[in-house]
């Protein structure tokens, strides 16, 4: 019988895994089994946090808008401000409103005066 030599597929797979895990600490970057487990954990965390990042930014924008509104006493609350925006059909999302609140407060005051009941 002729000798069958091992292929390169498993080695290539482990090399790819090693490159992915090269920045991990300790055995997580050296041992194949722990590298595999850590890779799965890293990808799970990345997937989860992509959704979480969207929620976090939305919370930040709402907090910034609310802070400027309360500082000036323009409206009673953020809630009423957004409600009046929708009633007047002004299409400004929270990200844009937060940028306006930070960079150009007088513009936000003008918007609030426009939508007052």
Swiss-Prot record:
Entry's Gene Ontology cellular component terms: chloroplast; ribonucleoprotein complex; ribosome
Species this chain originates from: Draba nemorosa (Woodland whitlowgrass)
Gene Ontology terms, MF aspect: rRNA binding; structural constituent of ribosome
Domain of life: Eukaryota
Role this protein plays: Binds directly to 23S ribosomal RNA and is necessary for the in vitro assembly process of the 50S ribosomal subunit. It is not involved in the protein synthesizing functions of that subunit.
UniProt keywords, alphabetically: Chloroplast, Plastid, Ribonucleoprotein, Ribosomal protein, RNA-binding, rRNA-binding
Family: Belongs to the bacterial ribosomal protein bL20 family.
Gene Ontology BP, a term: ribosomal large subunit assembly
Underlying gene: rpl20
Identification of the protein by name: Large ribosomal subunit protein bL20c
InterPro entries: Ribosomal_bL20 (IPR005813), RIBOSOMAL_L20_CS (IPR049946), Ribosomal_protein_bL20_C (IPR035566)
Gene3D superfamilies attached to this UniProt entry: 6.10.160.10, Ribosomal protein L20
PROSITE patterns listed in its UniProt record: RIBOSOMAL_L20
Protein's cellular compartments: Plastid, Chloroplast
Pfam families cross-referenced by the UniProt entry: Ribosomal_L20
């Amino acid at each position: 019988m002729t000798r069958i030599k091992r292929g390169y597929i498993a080695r290539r797979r482990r090399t790819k895994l090693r490159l992915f895990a090269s920045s991990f600490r300790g055995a997580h970057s050296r041992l194949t089994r722990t590298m595999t487990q850590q890779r799965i954990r890293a990808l799970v965390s990345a997937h989860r946090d992509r959704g979480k990042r969207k929620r976090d930014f939305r919370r930040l924008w709402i907090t910034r808008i609310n802070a400027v509104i309360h500082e000036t006493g323009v409206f009673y609350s953020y809630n009423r401000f957004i409600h009046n925006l929708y009633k007047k059909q002004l299409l400004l999302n929270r990200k844009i409103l937060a940028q306006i609140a930070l960079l150009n407060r007088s513009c936000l005051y003008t918007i609030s005066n426009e939508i007052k009941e």
